[in-house]
């Protein structure tokens, strides 16, 4: 990656221009850098899917924000820059008490978790969930939010230290040393869980099906282990009346993203402001060290989010 000077973005009538103070680093950014994550047509090639900063300008049709507002936003791209144009419907006020760096770690993971766990997965208080990749940015968001909303939470992680870190929110299993399916069976008296949030994909498909309760929901949001599931157990799927679904965030329409933002403002912002959940920042790098930030995320050693900060 190279840092270059560019033009300050122009904004449309439904957009805001944000002076970026911090930006979140996400796996799609790494995939984009590697040429494995094609951008939607018409989107800037500059990476960066979430930012926090100060509103500089608002479009003619924007009434929810004014210059000077502290905001965080889910971008369509372009977050790795000092200035970013974002649809106003994907922009939210920074929750009280959070820094720019903390706020920059919110949008991508909270939008993703809300859309997949609560909208697609229909998880309800009193139900149970297994979160694969529990120490990732999405994972730490999911376990905290589900715990705060009254669900029983299980998670898989790759290090014993991460089991300890997640203990306030979830019962975690080291998938490198234990068979997670066997452990979940023991922990649930072989009843299984209501929802599984999966980032692994193909290799976990049948084991995930086996862990679902009747009417359970498997929500797939990644395929880090492979995108092909071989020999799918259709009988288990049918007998359990299971639902298998999945989604991406970047390809959603502006209206869909705005609807998610409104739900977050209503249901999740009060939890953030009350301290019942919080973005976990593993590391922060200045923009000049963006390569190191990517290497940190790519190492898999992180717990929570990696962010970059802008300097004048």
Feature map (PLM): residue ranges:
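Adenosine-nucleotide cofactor-binding segment
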Residues: 131, 147-207, 259
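C-terminal capping/lid region of NAD(P)-dependent oxidoreductase domains
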Residues: 269, 274-283, 291-312
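Glycine-rich beta-strand-centered segment in the early N-terminal region that forms part
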Residues: 7-24, 36-78
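Short, well-ordered loop/turn sites that connect or cap secondary structure elements
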Residues: 65-66, 123, 212
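Glycine-rich phosphate-binding loop and adjacent beta-alpha segment
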Residues: 149-152, 157, 203-276, 309-312
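Short, glycine/polar-rich helix-capping loops at beta-to-alpha or helix-loop-helix junctions
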Residues: 79-82, 157-165, 229-233
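N-terminal Rossmann-fold NAD(P) dinucleotide-binding loop
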Residues: 139-140
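NAD(P)H dinucleotide-binding glycine-rich loop of Rossmann-like/cofactor-binding domains
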Residues: 31, 42-44, 70-135
């Amino acid at each position: 990656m190279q840092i270059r000077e560019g033009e300050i973005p122009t904004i449309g009538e439904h957009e805001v221009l944000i002076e970026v103070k911090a930006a979140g680093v996400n796996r799609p950014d790494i995939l984009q850098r590697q040429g494995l994550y094609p951008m939607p047509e018409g989107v800037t090639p500059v990476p960066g899917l979430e930012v926090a900063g100060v509103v500089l300008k608002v479009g003619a049709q924007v009434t929810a924000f004014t210059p000077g507002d502290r905001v965080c936003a889910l971008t369509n791209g372009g977050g790795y820059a000092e200035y970013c144009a974002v649809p106003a419907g994907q922009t939210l006020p920074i929750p009280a008490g959070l820094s720019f760096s903390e706020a920059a770690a919110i949008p991508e993971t909270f939008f993703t978790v809300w859309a997949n766990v609560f909208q697609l997965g229909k998880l309800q208080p009193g139900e149970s969930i297994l979160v694969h990749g529990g120490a990732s940015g999405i994972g730490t968001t999911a376990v905290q939010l589900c715990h705060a909303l009254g669900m029983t939470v299980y998670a898989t992680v790759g290090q014993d230290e991460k089991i300890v870190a997640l203990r306030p929110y979830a019962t975690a299993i080291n998938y490198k040393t234990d068979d997670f399916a066997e452990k979940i069976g023991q922990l649930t008296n072989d009843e299984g869980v209501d929802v599984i949030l999966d980032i692994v994909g193909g290799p976990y498909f049948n084991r995930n099906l086996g862990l679902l309760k009747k009417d359970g929901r498997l929500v797939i949001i990644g395929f880090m282990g492979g995108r092909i599931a071989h020999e799918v157990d259709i009988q288990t799927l049918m007998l359990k009346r299971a639902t298998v679904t999945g989604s991406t965030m970047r390809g959603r329409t502006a209206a869909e993203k705005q609807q998610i933002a409104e739900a977050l403002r209503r249901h999740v912002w009060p939890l953030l402001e009350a301290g019942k959940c919080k973005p976990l920042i593993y590391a922060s790098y200045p923009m000049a060290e963006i390569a190191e930030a990517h290497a940190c995320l790519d190492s898999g050693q992180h717990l929570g989010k990696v962010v970059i900060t802008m300097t004048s």
